[in-house]
């Protein structure tokens, strides 16, 4: 088996930054997208980490802004025949797995995810084969092929509850791909978890020294942290949770100032939820010339207005998501297990 992904040494195929549009160009593409959505019987679903103007457009056109699973779930229930998925590639794949009868379009199929890239299916299969006694649980941020190998798919919003459940059944776990989220879940549940060593390029950049300095500057601020962050950052948090859970925490915490350690794309919906509170970005390591993500996923940034318009207008191999049917059927099994489990929690 080849060496597993190491976020400290990996070379990411970062995309070029999109060319900024003028005000007139933005207005032109916004109107064009609205028209094309109607003509195509399409609905737009956008992730919390996309740029604010993309989230705003999804709102204005009756679409959805949420985490990756809710995006796919919304799309499956919506009567539209076409889903425009503004996010990264695995999100489009998940939408296709749950809605095979629908046309799934993305602004670009080149929008990757460091967690997905960091868990190649060949290496992961070998890893699982080496530990056949373990139940395989994979994060939503994985390819359809990796999901197809799993017993369960999970999102950060129900990860603790699911592992608690599996641990109560005496099951030992393989967790992939995010090592930080895996360790957080392990600490919360005490489960027997063997972690794959992947990491999110955005959350892995948050460092304690810079966050401590910001905390000293704003001692009245609460710290909100996504569990994909390193353990030392999680330990500093007043609230830890998924994107939707962090937005909920922003509303319930009494603090008027919040330091947020996740992708800054979340600020659009979080600020809507708490319009009277001040939101501060948690600092990332290597700011300036050596900054890598700077608290914003470079692949999420590929979801621009021009690319969305082109996807709706052109379709084709550059924009339409396809998943092999046999692979889709296998990946659907652990996804449905998760959906059924999540339904019991809501009940």
Curated annotation (Swiss-Prot):
Reaction(s) catalysed (UniProt annotation): iminosuccinate + dihydroxyacetone phosphate = quinolinate + phosphate + 2 H2O + H(+)
Sequence positions that bind iminosuccinate: 47, 68, 139-141, 156, 226-228, 243
Localization annotation: Cytoplasm
Stated consequence of mutating residue 291 to S: Activity is 3.3-fold lower under oxic conditions than under anoxic conditions
Domain of life: Bacteria
Keyword Transit peptide: no
Biological process terms in GO annotation: 'de novo' NAD biosynthetic process from L-aspartate
Top EC category: transferase
Family annotation (Gene3D superfamilies): NadA-like
Cofactor binding summary note: Binds 1 [4Fe-4S] cluster per subunit.
Cofactor annotation: [4Fe-4S] cluster
Annotated EC: 2.5.1.72
Subunit structure: Monomer. Homodimer.
PANTHER family in the record: QUINOLINATE SYNTHASE, CHLOROPLASTIC (PTHR30573:SF0), QUINOLINATE SYNTHETASE A (PTHR30573)
Membership in a protein family: Belongs to the quinolinate synthase family. Type 1 subfamily.
Name of the featured protein: Quinolinate synthase
């Amino acid at each position: 088996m080849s060496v597993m992904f190491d976020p400290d040494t990996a070379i990411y195929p970062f995309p070029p930054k999109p060319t900024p549009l003028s005000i007139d160009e933005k207005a032109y593409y916004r109107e064009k997208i609205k028209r094309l959505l109607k003509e195509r019987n399409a609905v737009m679903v956008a992730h919390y980490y996309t740029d604010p103007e993309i989230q705003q457009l999804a709102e204005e056109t009756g679409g959805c802004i949420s985490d990756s699973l809710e995006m796919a779930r919304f799309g499956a229930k919506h009567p539209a025949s076409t889903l425009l998925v503004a996010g990264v590639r695995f999100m489009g794949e998940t939408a296709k797995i749950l809605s095979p009868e629908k046309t799934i379009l993305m602004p670009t199929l080149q929008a990757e995810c460091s967690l997905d890239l960091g868990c190649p299916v060949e290496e992961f299969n070998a890893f699982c084969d080496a530990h056949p006694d373990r139940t395989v649980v994979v994060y939503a941020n994985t390819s359809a092929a990796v999901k197809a190998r799993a017993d369960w798919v999970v999102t950060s919003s129900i990860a603790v509850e699911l592992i608690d459940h599996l641990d109560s059944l005496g099951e030992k776990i393989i967790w992939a791909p995010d090592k930080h989220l895996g360790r957080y879940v392990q600490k919360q549940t005490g489960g027997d978890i063997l972690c794959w060593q992947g990491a999110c390029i955005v959350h892995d950049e948050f460092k304690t020294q810079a966050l401590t300095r910001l905390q000293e500057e704003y001692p009245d601020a609460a710290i909100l942290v996504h569990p994909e962050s390193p353990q030392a950052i999680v330990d500093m948090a007043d609230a830890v949770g998924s994107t939707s859970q962090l937005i909920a925490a922003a509303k319930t915490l009494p603090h008027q100032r919040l330091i947020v350690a996740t992708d800054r794309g979340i600020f659009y919906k979080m600020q809507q939820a708490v319009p009277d509170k001040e939101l501060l970005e948690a600092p990332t390591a290597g700011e300036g010339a050596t900054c890598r993500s700077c608290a914003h996923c470079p692949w999420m940034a590929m979801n621009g207005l021009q690319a969305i318009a082109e996807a709706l207008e052109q379709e084709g191999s550059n924009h339409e998501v396809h998943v092999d049917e046999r692979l889709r059927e296998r990946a659907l099994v652990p996804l449905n297990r998760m959906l059924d489990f999540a339904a019991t929690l809501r009940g």
